[in-house]
Amino acid sequence: MSGHSKFANIKHKKAANDAAKGKIFTRLGREIAVAVKEGGADPANNSKLKDIIAKAKSNNMPNDTIERSIKKAAGDLGAVNYEFVSYEGYGPKGSAIIVEALTDNKNRTASNIRNAFTKGNGSIGTQGCVSFMFDEKGFILVDKEEYEGDADELMMIALDAGAEDMSEEDDCFEIYTSPDDFSAVRENLENAGIPMAEAEVTMIPQTFVSLTDEIDIKNFQRTMDLLDDDDDVQNVYHNVEE
């Protein structure tokens, strides 16, 4: 699992950027809508919705906004039907990029994402062309400033909760689970009073690519900026070391 802290930093930067643009709540609202459509409006019987609600709260989404999103999706009152789509492609130096989106217009989304790759001198590939370079894992981040215990104590709690592994970084602890066990582990940690700064099922790069050429760096950032600006895009995973 070494090297994942770089990925966590990438995700933190994206989250901070989204919050500054006022887009993070829109993206979370779409995730809530899809979860409700798939499994119902009761988080007690819908683990996916329960996980997204926890994620929304960790991003400071107001409770009334969360409730409105759930009721809107459950009642079909003006609700938009979003469809999950994913794209895989290449950035500079063969770097791997995975884009996940929720959209009500697949043609629009495909065009925008293709443009983002092209503007950065990259290209969209076929499904599966880069996903084999990533591992799907549950990822839980515990900020050392928020957690008062020590590493050994947290390791015991995490493993007892069903986690696969844990690593310690300079300012945080990173806990990993299988995708199937993520919901149970997150809930067990929550019940144990463990503060979680981040908790989600994500794609972790097996190896990283380093960009040293200034043009490559600018092209890659151009693609990332365009994807960040797209309201349809929910998640972007890549293996570029920043």
Could you tell me what each predicted segment is?
Residues 1-125, 130-139, 181, 241:
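N-terminal cationic and glycine-rich segments that engage phosphates or anionic surfaces
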Residues 139-242:
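Positively charged, low-complexity, intrinsically disordered RNA-binding extensions
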